[in-house]
């Protein structure tokens, strides 16, 4: 992996890979000055650099080395839930991603831009993508947010599950409000 390549090709560097909760946790580690490189999403990186949102009052002096791949926001449900649009999340059980992850950050932004309140309008769970898929299959949640590349195997596997009809909830109407508040970080495909 990347740690092995860095250790092999960067003189004097001994890199190790560390499992974290995602972009926010990675950026918090960068802020300690101990790791030199981390994988993060652009919106979480900008928040860290500006010292806003989860980094309020604690800006992190980060620099971007490379963009590896574009991430896509998935708002995933199944037809049995009755969720057809973002407003239908009201009163539902929704996973907004692992706590402290960039999925959670972006989910909160999409929810707000769609005119919903993450604390009052839904019952929230904080699950990773695999846990969210299992919870949706078991009908413990009604929908989940996930930010990742295409294809994401957990979402693909959900769609291939017998008896499950996958529903991707359109959230493109939230884009203008997100760009207005956070800048041109978000685009429609």
Residue ranges and their predicted role:
Residues 22-24, 69, 101, 131, ...:
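Residue-level detector of flexible, active-site-proximal loop/helix-junction positions
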Residues 56-68:
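A structural signal for short loop-to-beta-strand junctions that line the ligand-binding cleft
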Residues 42, 53, 118-189:
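Pocket-lining segment of extracytoplasmic ligand-binding domains
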Residues 16-57, 75, 83, 130-135, ...:
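Pocket-flanking alpha-helical
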Residues 21, 98, 145:
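Conserved residues at beta->alpha junctions
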